[in-house]
UniProtKB/Swiss-Prot annotation:
Name of the protein: Tumor protein D54
Bias-annotated ranges (Polar residues): 1-14
PANTHER family attached to this UniProt entry: TUMOR PROTEIN D52, TUMOR PROTEIN D54
Basic and acidic residues: bias regions: 175-185
Gene designation: TPD52L2
Length: 206
């Protein structure tokens, strides 16, 4: 009787034969460790995609190495040419800003803002607000002009008043008096100077 078909009875004297024979069977570890294929892909397609993925990853690593080497070479050339880091930074910022300006997102945003601005300026509320502000400005200008005219008229009335004329006459009188005294003082200077020119008499001899 074959051992595979023996009765697995705990009370049977041959109860250890089946387990001993199963331990001798080799196990395929490769099959057990293999992951199941992705749903919808055959094993061949999966292997092909994995090979392509490995190739792309290797190309990415190579490109990064090439880029790093190019950047080092570029930095060395700039150093030898005397180009400062600040100049390179400005150039990079300028290039980045240009890239932003020509990007689709920036262009769409600018167009959207232009549309909003046009809608706002064409709206009735904006027009009414603009008209109100214009009218307020005109009223303010008219009020300032009226106030200036009133001040000028008031000053004219003050100059024509008796009080102002009396004050003006007093100022004129004081001015005339000051000028007259100054002229009289200048005329008296030669006489005093003339008396000073008189020669002194010789002292009497002892």
């Amino acid at each position: 009787m074959d051992s595979a078909g023996q009765d697995i009875n705990l009370n049977s004297p041959n109860k250890g034969l089946l387990s001993d024979s199963m331990t001798d069977v080799p196990v395929d570890t490769g099959v057990a460790a293999r992951t199941p294929a992705v749903e919808g892909l055959t094993e061949a397609e999966e292997e092909e995609l994995r090979a392509e993925l490995t190739k792309v990853e290797e190309e990415i690593v190579t490109l990064r190495q090439v880029l790093a080497a190019k950047e080092r070479h570029c930095g060395e050339l700039k150093r030898r040419l005397g180009l400062s880091t600040l100049g390179g930074l400005k150039q990079n910022l300028s290039r980045s800003w240009h890239d932003v300006q020509v990007s689709n997102a920036y262009v769409k945003t600018s167009e959207k803002l232009g549309e909003w601005n046009e809608k706002v300026t064409q709206s009735d509320l904006y027009k009414k607000t603009q008209e109100t502000l214009s009218q307020a400005g005109q009223k303010t200008s008219a009020a300032l002009s009226t106030m200036g005219s009133a001040i000028s008229r008031k000053l004219g009335d003050m100059r024509n008043s008796a009080t102002f004329k009396s004050f003006e006459d007093r100022v004129g009188t004081i001015k005339s008096k000051v000028v007259g005294d100054r002229e009289n003082g200048s005329d008296s200077l030669p006489s005093s100077a003339g008396s000073g020119d008189k020669p002194l008499s010789d002292p009497a001899p002892f």
